[in-house]
């Protein structure tokens, strides 16, 4: 498989399908956690739902590190610059270690405040912090896995990480009930057990990816000299990674705003919305897979100055994404009253889940435009563009919707219809901007890094 020569639609499918399957199992992983949290209590389900914006800081950091490594190493592969491949690989690991320490410190010291900010009662806050504290102690594993895997993604290998996520999923199914409810000498740990199962699965993932990377031919000439910190490479990684991390972390702000507003209804509304978003995540998996594919494809072709292939990759991915999400939206709407019963039997929780999913069905086709446009800019090393897009979507739009909803005294449904209108407006604006960028600025864009 050659990312700079093979047929573009073939490459998108070839890379996106394994990535989508891997992400499917990652989402199933989260669904299993949600399922078992619901078995503990509605309060535990609410705590896990509210912990996601906090936990998402680790996810955002991991995405930033992964995209930086994939795009910078991918560009170096396209340029056939072996020295840069080795330096970027070694420095993405160093950067990952440094940033994981910072993330752990922030998470352990500020999680409780965020739970209270979302209007959580004492029980939900206690359950939530019991979960997030353990997750933050293990954050180094999350970030090291994606740091190492960025080399594989840059080459177009999405199968290894897919296999890792599948293994992690089955481990999680086995470990969750053991640590939650207790087994033999292991005591019942409740929500703490969910977190411990996650950390063990991440440790296994780290070992698998490390073995695969050690066997990679591209780093056979690496030596300890490449791990002496060089400002040039750390700087490039920082300015490629941090805008993405900051921008995607904005999702935590968005989720906090949403949870704060719907929490005015009840904790059941929070639990119902939290369960519904797990379903939404499953539906979005093909888009995330396509996004992973185009970052690898565009990064190498951009590095090789093959601008027509860059353009074709973007538009092929948009067509695929829109088709998939239109079909998915129809399915979500039709099954909105059935699927949430997997997570809860509480009538109020189910009612809120169904109401959100029937609105989400109309938002789904807007998502491929947003995610794939961001992937386009990330692959071009234009992280500042992706950062601005995410700030608009995850900070400015939620704040606007929040205050507009308060002004209109909007109920649960009205709040999310406002949300849908703003999501579509932003996505259409972004599509027009990318078309303009491709037509007038693509082959003139900076090649400094």
Placement of each model-derived feature along the sequence:
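Transmembrane helical elements of multi-pass membrane transporters/channels
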Residues: 14-33, 134, 145, 168, ...
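Interfacial/gating helices of multi-pass transporter permease domains
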Residues: 37-56, 88, 122-127, 191-192, ...
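Alpha-helical transmembrane segments and their lipid-water interface positions
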Residues: 26, 30-33, 37, 59-66, ...
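Short alpha-helical transmembrane segments in multi-pass integral membrane proteins
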Residues: 1-18, 73-140, 188-242, 298-363, ...
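Transmembrane alpha-helix boundary and packing residues in multipass membrane permease domains
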Residues: 19, 23, 34-35, 71, ...
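Small-residue-rich hydrophobic transmembrane alpha-helices
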Residues: 45-105, 142-156, 160-161, 259, ...
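Short runs within selected transmembrane alpha-helices of multi-pass transporters and secretion channels
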Residues: 66, 135-153, 161-172, 194-209, ...
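Helix-terminus/linker motif at the lipid-water interface of multi-pass membrane proteins
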Residues: 28-46, 115-122, 180-189, 249-276, ...
């Amino acid at each position: 498989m050659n990312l700079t020569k093979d047929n573009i639609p073939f490459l998108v499918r070839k890379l996106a399908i394994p990535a989508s399957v891997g992400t499917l199992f990652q989402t199933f992983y989260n669904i299993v956690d949600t399922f078992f949290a619901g078995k503990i209590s509605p309060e535990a389900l609410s705590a896990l739902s509210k912990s996601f914006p906090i936990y998402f800081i680790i996810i955002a950091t991991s995405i930033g590190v992964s995209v930086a490594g994939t795009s910078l190493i991918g560009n170096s592969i396209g340029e056939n610059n072996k020295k840069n491949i080795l330096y970027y690989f070694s420095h993405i690991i160093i950067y990952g270690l440094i940033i994981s320490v910072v993330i752990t410190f922030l998470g352990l010291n500020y999680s409780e405040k965020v739970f209270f900010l979302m209007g959580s009662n004492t029980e939900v806050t206690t359950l939530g912090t019991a979960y997030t504290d353990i997750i933050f102690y293990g954050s180094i594993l999350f970030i090291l896995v994606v740091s190492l895997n960025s080399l594989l993604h840059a080459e177009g290998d999405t199968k290894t990480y897919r296999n890792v996520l599948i293994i992690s999923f089955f481990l999680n199914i086995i470990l969750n009930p053991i640590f939650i409810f207790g087994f033999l000498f292991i005591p019942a740990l409740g929500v703490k057990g969910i977190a411990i199962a996650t950390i063990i699965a991440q440790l296994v993932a780290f070992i698998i990816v490390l073995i695969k990377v050690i066997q990679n031919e591209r780093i056979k000439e690496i030596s300890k000299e490449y791990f002496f910190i060089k400002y040039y490479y750390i700087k490039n990684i920082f300015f490629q990674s941090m805008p993405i991390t900051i921008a995607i972390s904005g999702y935590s702000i968005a989720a906090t705003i949403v949870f704060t507003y719907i929490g005015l209804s009840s904790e059941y509304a929070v639990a119902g919305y939290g369960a519904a978003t797990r379903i939404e995540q499953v539906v979005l998996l093909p888009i995330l897979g396509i996004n992973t594919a185009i970052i690898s494809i565009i990064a190498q072709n951009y590095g090789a100055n093959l601008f027509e292939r860059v353009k074709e990759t973007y538009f092929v991915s948009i067509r695929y994404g829109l088709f998939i999400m239109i079909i998915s939206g129809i399915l979500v709407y039709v099954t909105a009253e059935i699927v949430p019963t997997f997570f809860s039997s509480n009538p109020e929780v189910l009612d809120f889940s169904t109401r959100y999913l029937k609105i989400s069905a109309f938002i789904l086709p807007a998502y491929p435009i947003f995610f794939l446009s961001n992937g386009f800019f990330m692959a071009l090393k234009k992280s500042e563009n992706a950062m601005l897009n995410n700030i608009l979507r995850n900070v400015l739009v939620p704040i606007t919707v929040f205050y507009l909803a308060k002004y209109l005294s909007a109920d649960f449904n009205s709040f999310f219809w406002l949300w849908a209108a703003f999501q579509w407006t932003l996505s259409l604006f972004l599509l027009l901007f990318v078309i303009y960028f491709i037509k007038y600025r693509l082959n003139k864009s900076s090649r400094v890094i």
